[in-house]
Amino acid sequence: MKLPIYLDYAATTPVDPRVAEKMMQCMTMDGIFGNPASRSHRYGWQAEEAVDIARNQIAELINADPREIVFTSGATESDNLAIKGVAHFYQKKGKHIITSKTEHKAVLDTCRQLEREGYEVTYLQPEANGLIPVAMIEAAMREDTLLVSIMQVNNEIGVIQDIDAIGELCRSRKIVFHVDAAQSAGKMPIDVQKTKVDLMSISAHKMYGPKGIGALYVSRKPRIRLEAAMHGGGHERGMRSGTLATHQIVGFGEAAAIAKTDMDSDNERIRRLRDKLWNGINHIEETYINGDMEQRHCGSLNVSFNFVEGESLMMALKDLAVSSGSACTSASLEPSYVLRALGLNDEMAHSSIRFSIGRFTTDEEIEHAIETITESIGNLREMSPLWEMFKDGIDLDSVQWAHH
């Protein structure tokens, strides 16, 4: 067993060896190294064919038309292109956007930028379980609403939003619907023909593909128009210029193909391991799960251990690679904005750890994790005066702390 144990699959996944092998065939002189836009010789044609195959594989994963897949550098760029692209193209229709407080920073910061440009954004507060009722979205809609952006699976707490119902609502009101599917694509079935989604952001490195490549699904029926952010050679039907990175795209395609075939067996095993982990630690006193347990991605577990400081717990769990909050914001010592939006106080938000399980997690690793967590929390609480006061029956909320 290799230490530290990797339990941070929501931050990134290792590249599947089958994916790495495919990528290696697209880099060197004896491989498919040409520029896919070179139309005058075989090197370009081979690269273009490799890109086309990958585009098909990614389209099949979400049941889209390959012409609806636009390659980007990742889900952050896809989110930016989708939200800014729609806002700028359809600004005559209105300047109101609806999103939620628990979205990824790539969506929230893009919306903040649009606010600086004169757009109006409504940030919905989810319920305590992390879910956003469709009625709440409907109540926020106005005549000038042009876009709704809601993620499918939350990166911190793993809850799944009802994008089918939200899609129906948006389509009936002729409002563009964007879904950030970075955490769900390749991990759960998605069918863009059934779900009325207009735009969907996808990332390769969350599904055992390489970093630095992603895609934006852009619906053709109804046709969604975007204002491009990257100008140049007119690649990707003018929506995203720049030479296509054949090796990354081929890796992305292979990762999507593997995800499609292995999804059921992967998820069954991952769910079993997640339940094993939760059953192994939920006997610890004052341990709470964050987010809805039913509407939840099978590999995700966000747990608050009361009276334990999250950062000190992370240090104590040096054998486990886990995180507090999302990888993009875990460097700041602010409590997670996602957990604060669920109504957790600062102390509980600070004492939370995200465990995310994936394709290469083993039973042995989960057993070791349970032991380590149980032992570390016991040790940290022994040192905590707050824990001692709590055990003595003192109501900590009623304590008047002196300010020196």
UniProtKB/Swiss-Prot annotation:
Cofactor(s) required, per the database record: pyridoxal 5'-phosphate
Active site, UniProt feature: C328 (cysteine persulfide intermediate)
Annotated EC: 2.8.1.7
UniProtKB keywords: 2Fe-2S, Cytoplasm, Iron, Iron-sulfur, Metal-binding, Pyridoxal phosphate, Transferase
Biological pathway: Cofactor biosynthesis; iron-sulfur cluster biosynthesis
Reaction(s) catalysed by this chain's protein: (sulfur carrier)-H + L-cysteine = (sulfur carrier)-SH + L-alanine
N6-(pyridoxal phosphate)lysine modified-residue sites: K206
Compartment list: Cytoplasm
Positions bound to pyridoxal 5'-phosphate: A75, T76, N155, Q183, S203, A204, H205, T243
One GO CC term, this protein: L-cysteine desulfurase complex
Gene3D superfamilies: Aspartate Aminotransferase, domain 1 (3.90.1150.10), Type I PLP-dependent aspartate aminotransferase-like (Major domain) (3.40.640.10)
Annotated [2Fe-2S] cluster binding sites: C328
Record-level GO BP terms: [2Fe-2S] cluster assembly
Any one Gene Ontology molecular-function term assigned to this protein's record: metal ion binding
Stated family: Belongs to the class-V pyridoxal-phosphate-dependent aminotransferase family. NifS/IscS subfamily.
Alphabetized NCBIfam families for the sequence: IscS, PRK02948.1, PRK14012.1
Known partners and oligomeric status: Homodimer. Forms a heterotetramer with IscU, interacts with other sulfur acceptors.
Function: Master enzyme that delivers sulfur to a number of partners involved in Fe-S cluster assembly, tRNA modification or cofactor biosynthesis. Catalyzes the removal of elemental sulfur atoms from cysteine to produce alanine. Functions as a sulfur delivery protein for Fe-S cluster synthesis onto IscU, an Fe-S scaffold assembly protein, as well as other S acceptor proteins.
Protein name (Swiss-Prot/TrEMBL): Cysteine desulfurase IscS
Taxonomic path: Bacteria, Pseudomonadati, Pseudomonadota, Gammaproteobacteria, Alteromonadales
